[in-house]
């Protein structure tokens, strides 16, 4: 039975290039999930966009002496160029700088305001006398009162993940000049989160299928009690407040950016010439998934659901499969200290599927995982090249050489051959279950295990020997190995779309795997084939030293 799936993916700040931490945290798992569901025949809408209004953008603009718009547009263009290289298959990738997004965000604000879920109040906000301005939360840094991390920001501690207010920080200082700010009164608008505490708690308690880290974090946060949060800031960059008399205020980015999931859906529908089409992905029997990093958990399991509850008429998240962090050579990714692997740079030297494979096999689903160049080389050479790639190359090459570039006639199959076909079908069934539950590491491990089993079958049958004495027996063995490869092209497709599409073409099916469905499609005897090229390339051991030296490790 087909499903309708909405996939919202975290919006990257348009203030820096994409690095592998971003990819492993949200974008790759979302793409795997989308490709899997499309192959199953499900309706899928996957959206995201560049967050153009965050304070990281204004901070970078001030550092470079240019406007925030110039910074945001520069990195938005870079993101747009990077996604195809990564194989990320968006249905709509946009930005928060569109008129459609501003309109949608303002409509959400007004809806909540008119229903009494947004109110205004006079509060004390950090003001830097030296810079002569109010400081947005990310312009304030200090020590986290909860975990004592010294690099906490005025909106959140990246170490323990807890949202913060600037006044809670210990030893706080202005990020721009380093001087301690003072607090002055200013009027702001607040989201009445406290009004949703009971409803949110009951809702979250039903999410027993959520990842343990996501569920526990959310329940722990709810038990501490929800505090109303300011949703406006004294800025000149961002979505204007849709009320007269407040021209100097903008919607706070954490409130505004999550509305992008809705505005992107509306933009997608308009681009199709069906302006109401977005509604089917936001109501009824649609399941909505939000792929994010763990620092975004409370915004997607508490704040965004509260906003949706307050507005009414829109689906709440079905699942929020947040990932933990990806470290690099046992160190946390850090853009400021150049401890990062930049997407465009690494893809200039290595194939996208090699990169996607390692990130999938080491995906930080329930705990932090490490990216190691030694592991990168080992998995590429031992698993992609020697196991999966070698299986495809020797089977397809033998078929093309000995059977006139056609899928061989296979006759009656013996028990061992039938057993491999059964195992291939079982693998597709098990990977389907794993992917449906967002267990990506388990799914790719199952696929590689089947490749290992197919290699054992091939070694037992030894068609290179059979061909010399019994061509019909060799034909049967090679045909069954091709059937296993047919299953593997499907199972690996969400993870490794480029090589899977090539393998599908070599098998005689054509490159569009999604049209075939999540089933074992048997090769057609007599089908014309083309001689294969290797799916993957071996990497030299010197890569480890070269790449660690490039990063100064």
Curated annotation (Swiss-Prot):
Its main location: cytoplasm. GO terms for molecular function: ATP binding; metal ion binding; methionine-tRNA ligase activity. A motif ('HIGH' region) lies at residues 12-22. Zn(2+) binds at residues 144, 147, 157, 160. Monomer. It is an enzyme of class 6 (ligase). Is required not only for elongation of protein synthesis but also for the initiation of all mRNA translation through initiator tRNA(fMet) aminoacylation. Its cofactor is Zn(2+). Binds 1 zinc ion per subunit. One of its GO terms (biological process) is methionyl-tRNA aminoacylation. Pfam families: Anticodon_3, tRNA-synt_1g. HAMAP family: Met_tRNA_synth_type1. It catalyses: tRNA(Met) + L-methionine + ATP = L-methionyl-tRNA(Met) + AMP + diphosphate. Keywords: Aminoacyl-tRNA synthetase, ATP-binding, Cytoplasm, Ligase, Metal-binding, Nucleotide-binding, Protein biosynthesis, Zinc. ATP binds at residue 335. The gene is metG. It is found in: Cytoplasm. This is Methionine--tRNA ligase. Belongs to the class-I aminoacyl-tRNA synthetase family. MetG type 1 subfamily. The lineage of its organism: Bacteria, Bacillati, Chloroflexota, Dehalococcoidia, Dehalococcoidales. One of its GO terms (cellular component) is cytosol. Its EC number is 6.1.1.10. A motif ('KMSKS' region) lies at residues 332-336. Gene3D superfamilies: HUPs (3.40.50.620), Isoleucyl-tRNA Synthetase, Domain 1 (1.10.730.10), Methionyl-tRNA synthetase, Zn-domain (2.20.28.20).
């Amino acid at each position: 039975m087909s499903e309708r799936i909405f996939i919202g993916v975290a919006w990257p700040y348009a203030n820096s290039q994409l690095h592998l931490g971003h990819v492993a945290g949200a974008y790759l798992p979302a793409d795997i999930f989308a490709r899997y569901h499309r192959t199953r025949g499900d309706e899928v809408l996957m959206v995201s966009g560049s967050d153009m209004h965050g304070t990281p953008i204004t901070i970078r603009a001030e550092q470079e002496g240019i406007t925030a718009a110039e910074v945001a547009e520069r990195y938005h263009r870079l993101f747009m160029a990077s996604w195809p290289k990564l194989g990320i298959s968006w249905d709509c990738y946009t930005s928060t700088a569109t008129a459609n997004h501003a309109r949608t965000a303002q409509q959400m604000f007004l809806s909540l305001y008119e229903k009494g879920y947004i109110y205004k109040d006079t509060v004390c906000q950090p003001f830097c006398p030296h810079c002569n301005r109010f400081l947005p939360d990310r312009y304030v840094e200090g020590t986290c009162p909860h975990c004592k991390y010294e690099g906490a920001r005025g909106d959140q501690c990246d170490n323990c993940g807890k949202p913060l207010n600037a006044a809670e920080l210990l030893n706080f200082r202005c990020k721009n000049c380093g001087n301690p700010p003072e607090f002055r009164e200013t009027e702001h608008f607040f989201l009445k989160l406290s009004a949703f505490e009971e409803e949110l708690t009951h809702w979250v308690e039903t999410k027993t299928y959520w990842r343990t880290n996501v569920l526990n974090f959310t329940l722990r946060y709810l038990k501490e009690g929800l505090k109303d949060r300011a949703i406006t800031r004294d800025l000149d960059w961002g979505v204007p407040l849709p009320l007269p008399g407040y021209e100097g205020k903008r919607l706070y980015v954490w409130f505004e950016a999550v509305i992008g999931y809705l505005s992107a859906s509306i933009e997608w529908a308009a681009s199709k010439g069906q302006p109401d089409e977005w509604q089917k992905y936001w109501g009824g029997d649609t399941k909505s998934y939000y792929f994010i990093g763990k620092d975004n958990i409370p915004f997607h399991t508490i704040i965004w659901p509260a906003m949706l509850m307050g507005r009414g008429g829109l689906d709440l998240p079905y699942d929020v499969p947040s990932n933990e962090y990806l470290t690099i050579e046992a160190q946390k990714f850090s853009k400021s200290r150049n401890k990062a692997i930049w997407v465009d740079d690494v893809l200039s030297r290595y194939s996208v599927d090699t990169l996607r494979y390692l990130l999938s096999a080491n995906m930080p689903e329930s705990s932090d995982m490490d990216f190691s160049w030694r592991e990168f080389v080992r998995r590429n050479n031992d698993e992609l090249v020697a196991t999966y790639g070698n299986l495809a190359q020797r089977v397809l090459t033998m078929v093309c050489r000995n059977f006139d570039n056609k899928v061989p006639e296979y006759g009656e199959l013996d028990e061992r051959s039938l057993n491999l076909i059964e195992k291939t079908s079982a693998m597709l069934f098990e990977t389907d279950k794993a992917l449906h539950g967002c267990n990506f590491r388990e799914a790719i491990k199952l696929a590689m295990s089947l490749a290992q089993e197919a290699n054992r079958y091939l070694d037992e049958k030894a068609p290179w020997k059979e061909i010399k004495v019994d061509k019909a027996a060799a034909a049967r063995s090679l045909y069954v190995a091709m059937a296993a490869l047919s299953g593997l092209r499907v199972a690996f497709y969400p993870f490794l779309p480029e090589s899977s599409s090539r393998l599908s073409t070599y098998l005689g099916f054509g490159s569009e795997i999604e049209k075939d469905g999540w089933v074992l499609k048997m090769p057609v005897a007599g089908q014309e084939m083309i001689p294969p090229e290797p799916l993957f390339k071996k990497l030299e051991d010197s890569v480890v030293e070269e790449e660690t030296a490039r990063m100064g490790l």
